[in-house]
Each structure stands twice: as structure tokens, then as C-alpha cells.
């Protein structure tokens, strides 16, 4: 039973899941919009929104906290200096998920995840 289980395992070990979320976040920050499976998009939404909330402060400690999660200088700088300031007056809901199609090979539900304009 999965009573009160707080996250999706996505069929991966914890380290693989952490690496997956980190890589998806870097891709989302760099391109602004990515297509992935719906469960991955839903997990990514929570991960990214926590990072943006932290990055909104824009100070040195925010840079360090975001870099600790992403380990990528370019994505960290873009998130803290370009993306997060756009959401200065918004309390959460920085991303949106749009269901797109059913993938032909395995019938997985696909979705776009992007930043709210």
C-alpha cells in the first residue's frame, strides 16, 4: 500500500531519480519548455518550483543553494538572474503542464512543462 507516500519513484533508485530531476531541470531552464512523460513532469514541477522560490531572493546564498542542486553554472546563473526575477510578485505556480499525446511505443502520457509567461 502507498498510503501517505509523498513522491513518485519513477521506477528508479533514489540517486538515479535525483540525477533525472537535476538533468530535466537544467534542460527546462536552458530551453524554457521540454516534453517528457506526465509523471516526470509532475515531479519536476515540485522540484523546479522549490528552486525558483529559493532563487527569487537573488543573493549570494540563493546562488549557492541553487548551484548545490543543479551543479551547473550556466543554468544556475540563468535561473537566478533571468527567470526568478520574472516571478518576484508571484507566490508559486511558476510552471504549467500541458498534456500533449500518447507516446506510440509504450502508450505513455506525454506532456510539455514550461514556465508561465
UniProtKB/Swiss-Prot annotation:
Biological process terms in GO annotation: translation
GO MF annotation: an example: structural constituent of ribosome
Gene Ontology CC, one term: cytosolic large ribosomal subunit
Record bears the keyword Ribonucleoprotein: yes
Keywords assigned by UniProt, alphabetized: Ribonucleoprotein, Ribosomal protein
InterPro entries according to UniProt: Ribosomal_bL17, Ribosomal_bL17_CS, Ribosomal_bL17_sf
Keyword Ribosomal protein: yes
Family: Belongs to the bacterial ribosomal protein bL17 family.
NCBIfam families: L17
Assembly mode: Part of the 50S ribosomal subunit. Contacts protein L32.
Cited PANTHER family: LARGE RIBOSOMAL SUBUNIT PROTEIN BL17M, RIBOSOMAL PROTEIN L17
Descriptive protein name: Large ribosomal subunit protein bL17
Organism: Campylobacter jejuni subsp. doylei (strain ATCC BAA-1458 / RM4099 / 269.97)
Lineage of the organism: Bacteria, Pseudomonadati, Campylobacterota, Epsilonproteobacteria, Campylobacterales
Amino acid at each position: 500500500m502507498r498510503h501517505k507516500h509523498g513522491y513518485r519513484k519513477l521506477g528508479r533508485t533514489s540517486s538515479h531519480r535525483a540525477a533525472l530531476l537535476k538533468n530535466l531541470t537544467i534542460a527546462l531552464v536552458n530551453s524554457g519548455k521540454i516534453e517528457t512523460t506526465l509523471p516526470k513532469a509532475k515531479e519536476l514541477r515540485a522540484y523546479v518550483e522549490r528552486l525558483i522560490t529559493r532563487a527569487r531572493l537573488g543573493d549570494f546564498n540563493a546562488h549557492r543553494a541553487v548551484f548545490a542542486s543543479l551543479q551547473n553554472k550556466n543554468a544556475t546563473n540563468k535561473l537566478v538572474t533571468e527567470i526568478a526575477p520574472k516571478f518576484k510578485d508571484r507566490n508559486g505556480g511558476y510552471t504549467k503542464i500541458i498534456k500533449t499525446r500518447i507516446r506510440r511505443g509504450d502508450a505513455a502520457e506525454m506532456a510539455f512543462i514550461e514556465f508561465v509567461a
